[in-house]
A protein has these predicted regions:
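Soluble extramembrane regions of membrane proteins in the secretory/endomembrane system
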Residues: 25-163
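Bacterial N-terminal signal peptides
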Residues: 10-22
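N-terminal secretory signal peptides that target proteins for export/translocation
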Residues: 1-6
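Positively charged, low-complexity intrinsically disordered regions
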Residues: 7-8, 18, 30-33
């Protein structure tokens, strides 16, 4: 056998014998599929969509259940405990009197993209009284029990007492 044929045969055998190890080594370096994120329980207040949040707030407030209505507001637990019900009642009154907008919020958990509004926010309209004006905005936040939920934004709530 010629030297050239021996070299070709040796090269072919080397490739055939080493290929399984090279493939196994390469596969071991590929990223492994991530385990699915743990499922969170559905939010009992239906705050998973902008639609569920605003109509849940209005339903609770209209029935006079301001403790539940306060759960739709972006505020600390301590502030919710001391001021939540009063602020929910005031917000409902302001919305009844001073809201201007098209109350057709998104039914999608991610909301609907709006020009000039960050992706984690939804602008529903404006409330105005005299020279004071405030956007009615929702913000998407993380909740330890329910995952991502929508709340009436703290930016909106800070303006409510002035309206």
């Amino acid at each position: 056998m010629s030297t050239f044929l021996r070299r070709i045969t040796f090269l072919a055998l080397t490739i055939v014998l080493c290929a399984p190890f090279a493939i196994e080594s390469a596969l071991g370096q590929l990223p492994q599929p991530k385990a699915p994120a743990p499922k969170t329980a559905p939010d009992p207040l239906d705050r998973g969509t902008p639609d569920g949040t605003i109509f849940g707030f209005l339903e609770a407030a209209q029935s006079g259940n301001y403790a539940i209505a306060a759960q739709y507001l972006q505020m600390s637990p301590a502030r919710r405990q001391t001021n939540g019900e009063a602020l929910a009642q005031k917000l409902k009154t302001v919305m009844d009197i001073a809201f201007a907008g098209n109350l057709k919020p998104s039914r999608e958990p991610e909301g609907t993209p709006q020009e000039g509004v960050p992706g984690d926010r939804q602008k529903l309209g404006t409330m105005s009284s005299g020279d004071v004006e405030a956007d009615l905005e929702l913000v998407r936040v993380s909740d330890a029990n329910a995952g991502k939920i929508w709340l009436i934004a703290s930016d909106t709530l800070t303006k409510v007492p002035e309206l």
